[in-house]
Amino acid sequence: MEKAHRPTHSKAIVFVLVAVVSGTLMDTLLKVAGAHVGTWQLLVLRWSFALLVLLPVILTGSAGSMHIQSWRVHIARGLLNCLGSYALFYALATLPLSVVITILFAEPLFVIPFAVLILHEQVGTKDVLAALLGLVGVVVMSQPDVSQGDWKMLLPLVAASSFALLNVLTKKWGAQESPVSLMLWMAVSTLLITIPFAASQWVELRWQDYGMALAIAVLGSVYSYFWIVGLRMGNVAKLTQLSFLSLPLAFGLGWAFFHEAPGAVTVWGALIIAAAVMLLSMNMARVKTAHVFLRRLFKPAKS
């Protein structure tokens, strides 16, 4: 059994690593594109190309059923995705890459209160401490700017909390649909919401902008698929710790491409948030099976 388990876990590690790198590269391209493209227009381009990326999988029938269980679920997910994505895209265009990704990294910590309120799940003292510690890290990173009236530092916080709530709602109501179906209707609902806003301020784009939007969509789809499948194959409590690689990767990309040298406050905030997520992961490793953590955060559950 253990020999059979090792190749699967090794494959899971590769999948999660691919997801982490793809997600960080996607955020980097979003920052580049945000300098030339408006946020609403970029949202439309990102999800239009995401829809095109999914179409071959859907048309071949390899993605399973596209049956919709509840339109309310997809509308709610679309609204949350619009809110989170808009906040993320605007934050990436106006804030240092390392700051945005570090605060967004605290997303699992925001799942805890939503899981209690919506799923009525019980959480331990260490879970609460991890969430509070992560909040301290966010405050440390954002306090200097917010105290000076720069509220843009709150945008990554809005994005992280929106995506956390989206994950919890997916767990509560999305079990009877395939992952590709959830991705498809997410793209459709997001486009229906964003197109009217983008149409009023649409500007002519360069071919490079369209190419960048396509690359962003591909990287986003790769991230979503490899992250979900990787976590389902392996020990989630261990695999999620690989996501820490996104922090040094974001710091390195920010320094190399945007000449962003992180200050002491940013580094301290990043360390505190990383410690909080590590505490949460270590606590989850002590439960009877890591799949409890998987079901709590990532795998949709039957309503």
PLM region spans:
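Helix-helix packing/entry segments at the starts of transmembrane helices
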Residues: V100-A106, W173-V188, S224-A256
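Membrane-interface helix-cap regions at the ends of transmembrane helices
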Residues: E2-K3, L51-Q69, V136-Q148, T190-D209, ...
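Alpha-helical transmembrane segments of compact multi-pass small-molecule transporters, enriched
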Residues: F49-V53, I103-L117, L132-L133, S189-I193, ...
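Loop-to-transmembrane-helix transition segments
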Residues: K11-V18, I58-L59, A63-A87, W151-A159, ...
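Loop-to-transmembrane alpha-helix entry segments
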Residues: I101-L104, H120-V140, V146, D150-M153, ...
